[in-house]
A protein has these predicted regions:
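Glycine-rich, positively charged N-terminal anion/phosphate-binding segment
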Residues: 5-13, 27-101
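Non-cysteine beta-strand/loop elements that form the S-adenosyl-L-methionine
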Residues: 50, 102-111, 186-197, 255-258
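Active-site beta->alpha loop and helix N-cap motifs at the rims of alpha/beta catalytic domains
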Residues: 75-146, 150-158, 162, 167-172
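A cross-domain feature marking catalytic cores of carbohydrate-active enzymes
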Residues: 26, 52, 80-82, 107, ...
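Active-site-adjacent beta->alpha loops and helix N-cap segments on the catalytic face
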Residues: 58-66, 111-136, 200-220, 262-267
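Alpha/beta catalytic cores of nucleotide-metabolism and tRNA/nucleoside-modifying enzymes
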Residues: 1-18, 22-23, 28, 132-135, ...
Length: 353
């Protein structure tokens, strides 16, 4: 059931309670409230993020629809898109009022559509404006204000050599330092750094996640330079060992598509980071029934089953019957009148959990 998400606990108390070592990135068309509810079942601690929502949409649109979420999703952060300080501050206040534990500003999305609105990755060229936006939000809310960014931005036509995108000269690192210094001075609580450059123009968002090479060394050097500012590294992490290694030098790791396609990585990380709890990996059957019950509640409120099941295709990844599980949820969930029982039926195609 969709809710405002309010918990009755003060924003300061909530901020102190959140374990920010592992998080799941905001991903357009993916990390909606149904996806977040599903992912929450794998770990009680992982910090989840909304899809990017523009400040203008929140101020002019249906806030219940845009900002509502199930309390079980907590801890969950709201990512905003925009470049106007007063507008972002008002949207941040709306997000805090809805119960989000953090407000994040998108300064990393390289898509042409986002760039046409003069926000996303192109904002990295305007550190003074971003600092003004952060300060305005910080003055308006008590929850932490964070920024998601790249290590830099370049303009390259697709036909040109991409080799220069791999280079990172002293001038580029100086620009990165100036940007982060401006964030820190404005009161940014945490910088979330995708360890790639953003190529503006000529590359699609998908290509921007693959063609610019990963430069964890740049993020590591940034952490050495800004030792007092929490820095989370994002980009390209594929398994638990890589994440745990990165936690040795960073303040957190943000996972993206790996968590979506192989959500059990979240359970593996939870167990690795909390060995004192001696909790076994959550059973797939338990997760399946949790989602079936959720679907029953949501369908009663008018939600289509397919809107929920589309996020569940990785539940039985690597297990016997996984292909049949995915096929049933991918197709039958779209049938008129499809109900939550379909989730249970799909689970029966797989090995006992």
């Amino acid at each position: 059931m969709q809710s405002t998400g309010k918990t009755g606990i003060s924003s300061d108390q909530e901020a102190e309670k959140v374990d920010r070592r592992i998080s799941v990135a905001p991903m357009m068309d993916w990390t909606d409230r149904h996806c977040r509810y599903f992912l929450r079942g794998f770990s009680p601690d992982v910090l989840l993020y909304t899809e990017m929502i523009t400040a203008a949409a929140i101020l002019r649109g249906d806030r219940v629809k845009l900002l509502g979420f199930d309390p079980e999703e907590q801890p969950v952060a709201l990512q905003l898109g925009g470049n106007e300080p007063a507008q972002l501050a008002a949207a941040a206040a709306a997000g805090e009022g809805a119960g989000y534990c953090e407000i994040n500003l998108n300064c990393g999305c390289p898509s042409d559509r986002v760039a046409s609105g003069a926000f996303g990755a192109c904002l990295m060229r305007e550190p003074a404006l971003v600092a003004e936006c952060v300060a305005a939000m910080r003055a308006r809310v008590r929850v932490p204000i964070t920024v998601k960014m790249r290590i830099g931005v370049v303009e390259r036509a697709k036909r040109e050599s991409i080799a220069s995108v791999a280079d990172f000269n002293d001038g580029e690192f100086d620009a990165l330092q100036r940007f982060v210094a401006a964030l820190e001075a404005a009161g940014c609580a945490r910088a979330i750094v995708h360890a790639r450059k953003a190529v503006l123009g000529g590359l699609s968002p998908k290509e921007n996640r693959a063609i610019p090479p990963l430069r964890y060394d740049i993020v590591r050097e940034l952490k050495r330079t800004f030792s007092q500012l929490p820095i989370v590294v994002n980009g390209g992490f594929r398994d638990t060992r890589e994440v745990l290694d990165a936690l040795g030098w960073s303040d957190g790791v943000m996972l993206g598509r790996e968590a979506y396609h192989r959500p059990f990585v979240l359970a593996e990380l939870h167990c690795a980071l909390h060995p004192e709890r001696t909790r076994p990996l959550v059973a797939r059957g338990t997760l399946l029934e949790r989602m079936a019950s959720y679907a029953e509640r949501e369908i009663a409120q008018g939600t289509r089953l397919a809107a929920i099941t589309r996020h569940m295709l990785g539940l039985y990844g690597g297990e016997p019957g996984a292909r049949e599980f995915r096929r049933l949820l991918s197709h039958a969930a779209h049938a008129p009148g499809a109900g939550a029982q379909l989730i249970r039926d799909a689970g029966r195609l797989c090995a006992p959990a």
